[in-house]
Amino acid sequence: MKNMKKWALAAALAIAATPAMAGSALQEILSEGVLKVGTTGDWNPMTMKDPATNSYKGYDIDVMTELAKDLGVEVEFVATDWKTLVSGVTSGKYHMTGSASISPKRAKAAGYSISYFSLATVPLTLTKNADRFREWTDLDKADVTVAATLGTTHESQVKEFFPNAKHKIVEAPARDFQEVLSMRADASITSNVEAKKLVQKYPQLMIVPVSKPKAPTPIAMLLPQADQVWINYVNTWISLKKERGFFDKIGAKWNLL
């Protein structure tokens, strides 16, 4: 582990010392000694914020803390929400984000790291609706309201998957599943990762037993689109950490494997 840290820091310093690389976020991170990471704090088990302490925990938090350690800097988690996740990167509010699903819309404005995890979309409903909703088609009806959260990939998916249903788009800090719990929506869609945690926390919720999840999607970190130096460094770090089992270890810790 010590050798890994020494390698990462040495590589970062060597790259950042190159005159052509002076404008990179990597140079700024090393000069200021701080890696700024945008995170929403509302995606269990990836990123969860404790309002009492303003501290974060989760899969993403562990990953970003490790990246900062290998860079030899401190990590600062910057609060953001889904609708401003990309703009926080493009405006320089933070150097990168935690996990975000890869989408062409986001890629028009921001860059991505290579992927290190995948997820898919599933619907949630109340357990009392078990007989009513069994498949995707059961939700695509005019008398059904399906919720999603503004700024997430699920916002567009809910319209794509359920063209005949009513759509309820909520804005953070409100969340789509809360609309189901309060019975303002019949169902919501979210990642299979979050759905698993939500049904554990709220026994009145259930995952609709669809034959197959939709939209399998790779997960990656959002980065400044034009900063190839920083993107290259992060990609190198991810590749090395994957080979050495780091992502498997963190995935197991948060029950993602």
Spans of features found by a protein language model:
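Short helix-initiation/N-cap motifs at beta->coil->alpha
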Residues: 61, 76-87, 168-182, 217
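A ligand-binding cleft/hinge motif common to bilobed small-molecule-binding domains
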Residues: 84, 100-109, 156-160, 181-182, ...
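Ligand-binding clefts/hinges and TM-proximal coupling segments of bilobed small-molecule sensing domains
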Residues: 24, 153-167, 207-209, 238-257
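A structural signal for short loop-to-beta-strand junctions that line the ligand-binding cleft
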Residues: 26, 56-60, 107-119, 207-211, ...
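Flexible hinge/capping segments at coil-to-helix
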Residues: 127-144
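Periplasmic-binding protein-like
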Residues: 118-122, 196-239, 257
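Extracytoplasmic small-molecule ligand-binding "clamshell" domains
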Residues: 23-100, 108
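Alpha-to-beta junction loops
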Residues: 35-36, 71-74, 90-99, 144-145, ...
